[in-house]
Every structure is written in structure tokens, then in C-alpha cells.
């Protein structure tokens, strides 16, 4: 397992840019996922994530240690994990994942939800989660909406 201890590490700097910048996420086509359950859901729908990152203290967590068993992971110092600022209390597991491309066309035979101008990532995430729970299979985000693959939307 490779360990990252320094804020000057180029990989950490890239993580920080992904965490803070929508422009960086669009440029790289990647986002950050926080937590075992979100990573599991992503992998079930889209395949393996690009990189798994675990906080030093999270190596002792039963759930996380079982999840990473046999997988290549990077170990990030706990203070660096907190520095990313994705959540107040990090879960201990992050993943760098490719953002799936949106479907080119709307399937008119399926339910859809249209969001327009909803800027708050927490609100976008809550609406998308509620719509998914109600069986809505498509979401269209209009101009001015928070990005669907923003870490804050995914966490909501």
C-alpha cells in the first residue's frame, strides 16, 4: 500500500482540486465518492472505480478493511483526508471515479424529473435521491443546477 503523508504530494493536490473544483471534475471526467456504500453503488452500476483511498485510522474499521481486502489502495494521512473537506467527519474511504456520460436522448416511455436552476448541491442530491426512491429513472438538469456528479450532490 502506498502512503501519502504530505500536502505537497502531486496526487493529493489532484484530489484537492477534484474536491473543490467543478472545472477540474469536468476537465478530468472524474469525481470523488465518499464511503463504502456510495462506492459499492457506483461499482454495481458502472464498474470499478479508478482509485481507492483509505484514511490511516480507517484501516482498523471492519467494514472498510473487508471492502478493501485484496484491492489496491492508497493510504492517506487522516489530516489530509480531513483537509479535502468533503464532509465534516470523513467515512475513511474515498474513491476517484469516472463520471458516466449522460444519455444522449430521453426515453419518453420512462418517468423523468426535470430540475432547473437549483443551485444548492444538497437540494439537488435530496431531490434526485427522492426521485430514485420513487422509481424515477431519468433526471434532466437544466442551466444553473448544481452538477449531478459533484461530491456534495452525491453525499446528500
Regions found by a protein language model. Give the residues of each.
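Structural motif
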Residues: 30, 50-52, 72-74, 92-95, ...
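Boundary-proximal intrinsically disordered activation/regulatory segments immediately upstream
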Residues: 1-61, 145-146, 151
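Glycine/small-residue-rich loop that forms an oxyanion/phosphate-binding "nest" at active or ligand-binding sites
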Residues: 62, 68-98
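A residue-level signal for conserved active-site and pocket-lining positions in enzyme catalytic cores
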Residues: 35, 95, 154
